[in-house]
Amino acid sequence: MFKKISLYITAIALALTMVSSAYAVTLKASHQWPGTARADGSYDPRHEMVQIIADEMKKANVDVDVRIYPAKSLYKPKEQWKPMTTGQLDMSAFPLGYAAKFHPEFDATLMPGTVKNHKHALKFNKSPMMVEIKKIINDAGVIVLSDAWLGGGFASKSKCIRNPR
C-alpha cells in the first residue's frame, strides 16, 4: 500500500513538473545593434537595455526567457514593426521612425534636436504629440516598455549641438 501511494505521489509530482515546464515561455527580442562586447568590454547601450530586461526576467524566476537577436539577425531594422503588431516578434528596440511607412507621424520622433537632454525627454514624453503617438502604438497592439531618447542628433567634433544655431 505504501509503495502504491509513493508511486502515485511520484506520478503527480512528475505530472506537475511537466505541466509547469509546458508553461515556460520564450520571448523573441530583436534589434539592429551589435550584441558583442567592444574592445573595452562595454556593449552598445541599446543592446544593454534589452539585455537588462532579459536578465531581470531570468532573475524573477517566472519561466519567461528572453532570447535576444542582435545585429539584424532576426529582422532588418525597418521590418520589425509589422511582426510586433502580429505577434511574430515579442520585443524590439528600434527608432520609432523606422515604422513611419505604416504611421507617418512616427517620423517626428526622429527629428534631430527634438530632445535636448534627459529632463527634456521626460517632459516631452507627456506632450500632446507623444500622447497621440502612444495612442497609435497602443491601438496597433504594441506596448512601450521604455522610452529611450538620445539628446542631440547632430554631429560635431568639438561639442554637443542641441539646436540649429
Locate each region found by the language model:
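Bacterial N-terminal signal peptides that target proteins for export
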Residues: M1-I9
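Bacterial N-terminal signal peptides
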Residues: I9-T17
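Sec/Tat signal peptide C-region and signal peptidase I cleavage site
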Residues: T17-A24
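Nucleotide donor/acceptor-binding cores
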Residues: V25-L27, R165
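Residues at or immediately flanking beta-strands
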Residues: T26, D63-R67
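Extracytoplasmic "Venus flytrap"
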Residues: K28-V50, A71-Y75
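Contiguous mixed-secondary-structure segments that line small-molecule binding/active-site clefts
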Residues: Q51-K58, D63, T85, D90, ...
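Short helix-initiation/N-cap motifs at beta->coil->alpha
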Residues: R67-K82
